[in-house]
Amino acid sequence: WKIIPKRRYLGNSVLSLLTKIASGYWHVADSQTGYTAVSLHVLQTINLDQIYTNYGMPNDLLVRLNVYGFRVRDVVIRPIYNIGEKSGINIAKVVFTMSFLLLRLFLWRIKERYVIRDFHPLVFFYAFALFLFIIDIPLSIRVLYVFCTTGSVPPINFLTTLFVSTMGVLFLLFAMWFDMEESK
């Protein structure tokens, strides 16, 4: 991390975290740096024509490997920076494109792996977390509005919002934990 430019390090760290969530491979430290070696069995199983062809290709491949139950190993390499290379990446475009791609891949993986191929209760945990976060948005806005207009919040409103927020976070963390255990 000392040799990588700070902006790249931050972007790569966020992208790696989102890729861990989307792919289910929590042990892969850096999904964007390195190389990919796969067996003939992988090549025969995964439809390579469906894999994203641009910057998100390693992320898409990791998700597909997880859906089909393949093991992945993280091989650490030493990246080389500041030798005159010029990145052609448009950060604003990549952030939007990759975020949408990873969300789509995450939802596809959850559906394929935990609903269609073999059911797992973590689907309910993710669904409850989403439901509670949707409920929490208007509750939080209301609590903030009441506080800004009156200077105080009725305790029941505050406690309800706190409860819904806490439960949403807990459901999300348990879903991620189950996913992590299932993908080892």
Please give the residue ranges for each predicted region.
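Hydrophobic helical membrane-anchoring modules
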Residues: Q50-K184
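Acceptor/aglycone-binding surface of glycosyltransferases and processive sugar-polymer synthases
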Residues: W1-Y55, Y81-F96
